[in-house]
Amino acid sequence: DNQYGHAYGNAIIPDTYTIDLTGFCMPTPSTKITSPFGPRWRRMHNGLDLKVNIGDTIVAAFDGKVRIVKYERRGYGKYVVIRHDNGLETIYGHLSKQLVEENQLVKAGEVIGLGGNTGRSTGSHLHFETRFLGIAINPIYMFDFPKQDIVADTYTFRKTKGVRSAGSHDTQVA
């Protein structure tokens, strides 16, 4: 977690919101998840880690606008945050090199950086995070990494408890 990844402040979180996932592009050809989303050690791991080699090409998951290009020595290392028209933001962490600038428009599949091992990292990988209004959502609820595809054309964000189904997941909001 960092101050730059939460730009929505006091935004009102809707009870439900349908996110269009069409137009998605896998951020890397890698299908190997080396660390899943969820509690880890004494903190929450708000994304998942995909195995990449240093220098591997990392691409934008959707069309969007680059919001942040920064370096955090004890966090994401060199990272990029992209805001997308579908309501999501994606975060790409531990890059060896960032190849975009803040406010730059990017297309899905466009190269945004190179795989790396910067910041708080134990080996070369891509930390990939998906957020809606600053709330981290497990990427596997939207994307099937082994198949390199989306789970469904849409994902329904729900902030209240209920029944889970393909393409939706209940997210607890503090």
Model-derived features: positions:
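Short hydrophobic beta/alpha edge segments that flank linear recognition/processing sites
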Residues: 50, 79-82, 107-119
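Short histidine-centered loop motifs in beta-beta connectors
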Residues: 53, 69, 86-109
